[in-house]
Amino acid sequence: MAVGKEIKTQIASIKSTQKITSAMQLVAASKMRKAQQRMAAGRPYADRIRSVISHIATANPEYRHLYLQEREAKRVGYIVVSTDRGLCGGLNVNAFREMMRSMKEWRDKGAEVDLCAVGQKAISFFRNYGGNVVAALSHLGDDPSLTKIVGSVKVMLDAYAEGKIDRLYLVHNRFVNTMTQKPTVAQLLPLPPAEDDEMIRRHWDYIYEPDAKGLLDGLLTRFIESQVYQAVVENNACEQAARMIAMKSATDNAGGIINELELAYNKARQAAITQEISEIVSGAAAV
């Protein structure tokens, strides 16, 4: 029964793959929980810095930092965060599609575009696509550190300070829940006005050391770095969630295929037995 042997070989192969996808699902679930914890731990820090920047800028209107000044956009920069590995559904493709939509809007207005690609998938995609990648960073791992990110962010901040770019956007996937990851394009520079009602209603008269200007300069740079770091951490949580869902789907699909093959094997075996019985009966009748 040659057909039956082939089917059994297929079943064994798919069961082996199913074990791998099931294990990957469990690993992704564990990594996702850790990434969610890092994501939750980083949010209060970024929110507090943003609040302090708003207070200082409001209390010192005579000093307008370069990062707060609006200017005509002739060249636009993007920091795009992706994954290093695949097997995470359409996570990267959705973010790239959203970013290319934004890029097209600026190019239609006559603006040029520079890119900082974080993650191997973004690097490969935009270099093949023809984007002007001026900075690249990959292999940050499942527990990225801020020190590894700072260098690439500085390239874009220096470009903004020198007038080489006039807008800076951050593109990444936002973690909504385990089933939903939303691609987001957020403006980093110039820093959008804060939507803090309490800050608008009240005024705090702080004393700054050494001075408000020096403090604001340092906080703005640190805020941009923290935003990119938070995006990398959040994108990692999205990656693990998407991979967990993709591997669960693959495991379930493998189970369905195995059931179909086992049914086909049983039918082939039944047909072979029926044929053997028919041959025996025919032989006995001939005798």
Curated annotation (Swiss-Prot):
Its main location: membrane. It is found in: Cell inner membrane. It is a peripheral membrane protein. One of its GO terms (molecular function) is proton-transporting ATP synthase activity, rotational mechanism. F-type ATPases have 2 components, CF(1) - the catalytic core - and CF(0) - the membrane proton channel. CF(1) has five subunits: alpha(3), beta(3), gamma(1), delta(1), epsilon(1). CF(0) has three main subunits: a, b and c. Belongs to the ATPase gamma chain family. PANTHER family: ATP SYNTHASE GAMMA CHAIN, ATP SYNTHASE SUBUNIT GAMMA, MITOCHONDRIAL. This is ATP synthase gamma chain. The gene is atpG.
